[in-house]
């Protein structure tokens, strides 16, 4: 997560944006800070179904048992949403991720109201897929 802000800084930066155009640009900027995926990480098993755009999310466990995320999308705003989700789940264990409901966070940022229905559905699909895959990750 090199380069991405922590959760508190994300909230501060988001609140400094004067309008939704600036907020969208900030989200896109966050997506641009994600490290590129390897060809191996772009494997079909990492492709998230339920998203209108192509979204890949790869997860591994650190030696400390925290989930390490890598992700990408072919749509800039979606790639930014991937980055926001990674910020929220940063440094958590699989059990913590499964039990953490991040939807209220998106509601607090008013993101839910300002995304198109297809983007909102895609965001929900991403969160569901992460929680499902992370449960499998901890089982192995």
From Swiss-Prot:
Record's GO cellular component terms: cytoplasm
Record carries keyword Repeat: no
Active-site positions on this chain: 51
Subcellular location(s) of the protein: Cytoplasm
InterPro entries, per the entry: Cysteine_desulfuration_SufE, Fe-S_metab-assoc_dom
One GO term (biological process): sulfur compound metabolic process
Disulfide bond positions: none
One Pfam family matching this protein: SufE
Alphabetic keyword roster: Cytoplasm
Pathway: Cofactor biosynthesis; iron-sulfur cluster biosynthesis
Function statement: Participates in cysteine desulfuration mediated by SufS. Cysteine desulfuration mobilizes sulfur from L-cysteine to yield L-alanine and constitutes an essential step in sulfur metabolism for biosynthesis of a variety of sulfur-containing biomolecules. Functions as a sulfur acceptor for SufS, by mediating the direct transfer of the sulfur atom from the S-sulfanylcysteine of SufS, an intermediate product of cysteine desulfuration process.
Subunit structure: Homodimer. Interacts with SufS.
Family named by the database record: Belongs to the SufE family.
Name of this protein: Cysteine desulfuration protein SufE
Organism lineage string: Bacteria, Pseudomonadati, Pseudomonadota, Gammaproteobacteria, Enterobacterales
């Amino acid at each position: 997560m090199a380069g991405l802000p922590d959760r508190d800084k994300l909230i501060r930066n988001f609140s400094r944006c004067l309008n939704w155009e600036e907020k969208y640009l900030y989200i896109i900027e966050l997506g641009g800070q994600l490290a590129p995926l390897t060809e191996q990480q772009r494997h079909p098993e990492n492709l998230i179904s339920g998203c209108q755009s192509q979204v890949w999310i790869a997860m591994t466990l650190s030696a400390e048992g925290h989930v390490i995320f890598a992700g990408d999308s072919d749509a800039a705003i979606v790639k930014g949403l991937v980055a926001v989700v990674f910020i929220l789940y940063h440094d958590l264990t699989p059990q913590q991720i499964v039990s953490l409901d991040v939807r209220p966070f998106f509601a607090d940022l008013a993101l839910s109201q300002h995304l198109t229905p297809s983007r909102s559905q895609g965001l929900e699909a991403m969160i569901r897929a992460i929680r499902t895959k992370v449960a499998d990750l901890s089982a192995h």
